[in-house]
Curated annotation (Swiss-Prot):
The modification Phosphothreonine is found at T198. The gene is dnaK. Gene3D superfamilies: 1.20.1270.10, 3.30.420.40, Actin, Chain A, domain 4, Substrate Binding Domain Of DNAk, Chain A, domain 1. InterPro entries: ATPase_NBD (IPR043129), Chaperone_DnaK (IPR012725), Heat_shock_70_CS (IPR018181), HSP70_C_sf (IPR029048), HSP70_peptide-bd_sf (IPR029047), Hsp_70_fam (IPR013126). This is Chaperone protein DnaK. Residues 598-636 are annotated as: Disordered. Keywords: ATP-binding, Chaperone, Nucleotide-binding, Phosphoprotein, Stress response. It holds the Pfam family HSP70. Induction: By stress conditions e.g. heat shock. It comes from Pelobacter propionicus (strain DSM 2379 / NBRC 103807 / OttBd1).
């Protein structure tokens, strides 16, 4: 079995880890960073940029730079969360044919799993560059509070990226795995995970290799992006008051505000005040305008007060569901970049009544946990048992539009549960099964996962036919539902996949597109490497030609010069093979030049050791045993 990589596919940043020599290792990307921005951009020339490259050009290309796509994954276009994003995103969020939220760049529409797949490909490439071998198997993390659609969409993203997703694992559970792998004593742990786009709280019992999730809660639309947006709004409002200009209509200015807001927020984690300076932010009839203002930590905490207050509810609910009080919790583990904010740490301390544990790297711990889980699945890590839970209740719609729950939230997975239902009318030939996920009493208030029909029920008075509905949740938290007529033995099942918005045909097409793009990327990389080698060859040959050109035959010299001209011509192209061929031809032609160089080096110099130096010693009558010593005058 090949290596299994662990990927933390984050809203703001992503990270990849692997087990090596019994230890989890976080792998640095080609830019040397251990985390990669989860950003994808499409340049003017059609090139696709991922990670730091995409982030660097965001200000000048805001409409085609896609970020925080994880917030759209598995979501419908008409939900409140998506409407909020549409209002503030510089790029287009569009409605797909099946009502899913998609994005548009350079006139082409992309599904969120497809954009996420581009980020996953970058993480896959990072691991392959490090290992020197192809990687296909992966464990990918998701927020614990992700519903079935979001989990399925994440799995689809992995498939599009060319990965075999062995397991979808909850982020807090992965963090607990990284924290508690070497701990033998039993303890109750709360994992407080506030990342770029989502908030999770999970309560676990761990000890001696067993990691049991007791409860989980959260908000899949609360994270660093929301804190940034409040700071952006504050800066824009202050500038409007001061200059009378509204920056919200200028996408380029807004992108600069976004970067400045994120930078200011990060700086205020370690300092009490920061300066925000954005020269030439806009212009009016009187000339260019510069944005200069100060933001204090106290002001930031006031601006973000509402969001900070939202963190408490899910924590209280999670403790209640686990049957524990704050005093029962032994450790609180902080995960996610937002937990560096002092106000968040104070909030955690107030909720749990103890100082949180800051012993793990909040940016890397989830990927490390995913890497460990990869080791568990491969058999490299022994004696680890992970018992996770389903975050939301599952059920079906019954008479009167009521949701009847078959599996309650926080049930350990994998699990299977059956219940017998009957018909609501006489001689009813079919039963429609409406599969739901959520905590509300009425069906309309919960999320629809899918619909299917069990047909061919023999005519009978209502209440007589017996229809057994079975829910099956696998270890990834993905749902399978079946319905069986116990009278006839007829069965109908549904694997809730349509909710991710991508059919098998669409996923297969995206896989093919991704593969062809990977080939293009490889060709570009090969061309760049060949060009770099050629450039080095041209430089060294031209330099040698200047120094030793007069030592070789004029015909040979002319041949070398011609080969340099030919190589320079093909270097501008994208054909790696042509560049390599021209480089080899130049190297072949330059052999005579190399011979001349070595011959020149072997000849005794004007004042060389052999020849005049030795003769001079004899003439001066110096004793052979006297050693000449160099000395250096030291100036004091």
């Amino acid at each position: 079995m090949s290596k299994v990589i662990g990927i933390d596919l984050g809203t703001t940043n992503s990270c990849v880890a692997i087990m090596e020599g019994g230890e989890p290792i976080v792998i640095a990307n080609s830019e040397g960073s251990r985390t990669t921005p989860s950003i994808v951009a499409f340049a003017d020339n059609g090139e696709r940029l991922v990670g730091q490259q995409a982030k660097r050009q965001a200000v000048t290309n805001p409409e085609n730079t896609l970020y925080a796509i994880k917030r759209l994954i598995g979501r419908k276009f008409d939900t409140e969360a998506v409407k909020r994003d549409i209002a503030i995103s510089p790029f287009k969020i569009v409605k797909a044919d099946n009502n899913d939220a998609w994005v548009e760049a350079r006139g082409k529409r992309y599904s969120p799993p497809e954009i996420s797949a581009f980020v996953l490909q970058k993480m896959k490439q990072t691991a392959e560059d490090y290992l020197g071998q192809t990687v296909t198997d992966a464990v990918i993390t998701v927020p614990a509070y992700f519903d079935d659609s979001q989990r399925q969409a994440t799995k689809d993203a992995g498939k599009i990226a060319g990965l075999n997703v062995l397991r979808i694992i909850n982020e807090p559970t992965a963090a607990a795995l990284a924290y508690g792998l070497d701990k033998k004593k039993e303890e109750k742990v709360a994992v407080f995970d506030l990342g770029g786009g989502t908030f999770d709280i999970s309560i676990l019992e761990l000890g001696d290799g067993v990691f049991e999730v007791k409860s989980t809660n959260g908000d899949t639309f609360l994270g660093g992006e929301d804190f940034d947006q409040l700071v952006i709004d504050w800066i824009a409002d202050e500038f409007h008051k001061d200059q009378g200009i509204n920056l919200r209509g200028d996408k380029m200015a807004l992108q600069r505000l976004k970067e400045a807001a994120e930078k200011a927020k990060c700086e205020l984690s370690s300092s009490m005040e920061t300066d925000i300076n954005l020269p030439f932010i806009t212009a009016d009839a009187s000339g260019p305008k510069h944005l200069t203002m100060k933001l204090s930590r106290a002001k930031l905490e006031t601006i973000c007060g509402e969001l900070l207050a939202k963190l408490e509810g899910p924590c209280r609910t999670a403790m209640k569901d686990a049957g524990l009080s704050a005093s029962d919790i032994d450790e609180v583990i902080l995960v996610g970049g937002m937990t560096r904010m002092p106000a968040v740490q104070k909030k955690v301390e107030a909720i749990f009544g103890k100082t949180p544990n800051r012993g793990v790297n909040p940016d890397e711990v989830v990927a490390i946990g995913a890497g460990i889980q990869g080791g568990v699945l491969k058999g490299d890590v022994k004696d680890v048992l992970l018992l996770d839970v389903t975050p939301l209740s599952l059920g079906i719609e019954t008479l009167g539009g009521v949701m009847t729950k078959l599996i309650e939230k926080n049930t350990t997975i994998p699990c299977r549960k059956s219940q017998v239902f009957s018909t609501a009318a006489d001689n009813q030939p079919a039963v429609s099964i409406h599969v739901l996920q959520g905590e509300r009493e009425m069906s309309r208030d919960n999320k629809t996962l899918g619909n299917f029909e069990l047909t061919g029920i023999p005519p009978a008075p209502r209440g007589i036919p017996q229809v057994e509905v079975t829910f099956d949740i696998d270890a990834n938290g993905i749902v399978h539902v079946s319905a069986k007529d116990l009278g006839t033995g007829k069965e109908q099942s549904i694997r809730i996949t349509a909710s991710s918005g991508l059919s098998k045909e669409e996923i297969d097409k995206m896989v093919r597109d991704a593969e062809s793009h990977a080939d293009e990327d490889k060709k570009k990389r090969d061309a760049i490497e060949a060009r770099n080698h050629a450039d080095s060859m041209v430089y060294s040959t031209e330099k040698s030609l200047k120094e030793f050109g007069d030592k070789i035959d004029a015909v040979e010299k002319g041949n070398i010069e011609n080969k340099i001209v030919e190589l320079k011509k093909v270097m501008d192209g994208e054909d790696a093979e042509a560049i390599k061929k021209a480089t080899d031809e130049l190297a072949q032609a330059a052999h005579k030049l190399a011979e001349a160089m070595y011959a020149a080096k072997e000849q005794p110099g004007e004042h060389g050791e052999t020849g005049s130096g030795e003769q001079a010693r004899k003439e001066s009558g110096k004793d052979e045993n006297v050693v000449d010593a160099d000395f250096e005058e030291v100036k004091k």
